[in-house]
Amino acid sequence: MNTDIVIIGAGPAGIFTAMELLRRGSKEKILLLEKGRSIETRKCPKAQTGRCMNCKPYCHITTGFSGAGAFSDGKLSLSPEVGGDLPQLIGEDTVQSLIEYTDSIYLEFGADTRVEGVSEKEAVKEIRKRAIQTGLKLVDCPIRHLGTEKAQEIYYAIEQYLLHNGVEIRFGCACSDLILKNDTCIGVHVAEGQNEYDVYAKQTVVAAGRRGADWFDKLCARHGIAHAPGTVDIGVRVEVRNEIMETVNNVLYESKLIGYPKPFKNKVRTFCQNPGGFVSQENYDNNLAVVNGHSYKDKKSDNTNLAILCSHNFNEPFNQPIEYAQKVGRSEEHTSELQSHTSI
């Protein structure tokens, strides 16, 4: 099989790669391969059963068109201070420009026009003052809340846009390997159900996301492709009554707080705060389960949940952050300890 451009993974990176090619007037044949399902057929059985069913071969919350974004809290963080090391790679001004551009696309596809955390300046000032008094930094981060259910509608509209503009999307297709010739990628090897075949392309984009990070790391090692370990965030998800977080919820919707507590002074931050939200389980490879938070526009609980994360960066000789995180996640001793800390 031949195409001009093949994209591995239909998460946000893969989706926006295809979309940007279209918006720039590309006439090339684009093939988007995704091992999960289309957005309209992705269903988590927990809604009916009330408990996680450990779906195989993959979790429908993490895998499928739009990745985990379709079932997450549905928030866009509109600040270059949030979201990784991209400002260090391409510059803060460029990142801010790209954030505004990406945000405009979400608005085109139906995102809520309201932005949280920017209207009550005096109240924000008071929250920042209280944060400073406790040794924390409050990050200025406007939030556009799509809502878990609205995010699915938006990604469905994007899926249909890609299809109507000629992008071929194949679901249930797992990329098992790259095809290299003279150190140049000329295609990918694909498994689709019981069938296996090769796709040859002029350009190959690998956008495997968090779900495919371990696979991509091993793929790079197998072919001698230069790559660097990223930051690993390990922590707990805490759930409290809405009344405790009422001021922060009403003023900011989500507070982005950073601290460097003693004795180790590692970076610790809050992440993914969900007022009136719901804690959810996500399953990855090797029987690793993690927790996330969902936040609907209309459906609300009596609790607020958020993650508290400690960031780790790894260098030689130990540069296997994914394996490190998996070992921590699988350790019963660590799990028991973390759960006891969460309950305090």
Per-region residue spans from a language model:
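Dinucleotide-binding Rossmann-like beta1-alpha1 core, especially the glycine-rich loop
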Residues: 64-117
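Residues forming the flavin
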Residues: 1-83, 122-336, 343
